[in-house]
Amino acid sequence: MTDVGLMSYYLGLEVKQMEDGIFISQESYTKEILKKFNMLDCNSVNTPMESGTKLSKFDEGEKVDPIFFKSLVGSLRYLTYTRPDILFAFGVVSHFVEAPTSTRLKVTRRILCYLKGTIDFGLFYSSSSDFNLVGFCDSDYAGDIDDRKSKTGFVFFLGDSVISWSSKKRPILTLSTCEAEYVAATSCTREDPVYHNRSKHIDTRYRFIKECITKKEVELKYVKSHDQAADIFIKPLKFEDFQRLRSRIGMKKKNQN
């Protein structure tokens, strides 16, 4: 066995070892994507999706090459491993991968324009971080204008370092904002990719969360909207809010102190 020193590259992930922590990014891969889709010279934008954007199956627009669109969306998927800031936007456009139109392509290309201006961004893991596990979860209500299903987002931190994140449309309808929040809280509490979403009764979710609290497995706390880190995973935000939450989830420039 040969000692080749500290890891600097692994499966497309660039790892920068620093005195105060580790910085992980995909700068080279991002440049490859921009070059592949002729976006190296595009004008950059401040957010991956414009605030208020909603896509629908009834959107107008000319049909575009489905192979090109699938390739573009597929290329973005791998980036979400180190770029949680594009996860929500990626989730929205990937929902329409089988029905690409010029309207949807425009929204997808905006993600590339955002990446152009943030090529050197990545995740920073501080060496001085504690080991307290903290999770944030949130949900919109009936946010999908086609089927009125809700979007759930959560993010987990170990100390100040983000370790897990998710942005998913729930496969069931929720009948109130309260129920949508219970679904989000249950999903976050379990943080389980095989969570059985077909258990529809709200009482089941309530009792599950209550049992976890009683056993002191979790501590549930109210979080003000301004401090809700999971908001970046459930809706397109204005730049000021997006920038603040992007920083909150540990994203920074490579040489930023």
Please give the residue ranges for each predicted region.
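Amphipathic alpha-helical interaction motifs in eukaryotic regulatory proteins
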Residues: 31-35, 56, 73, 77, ...
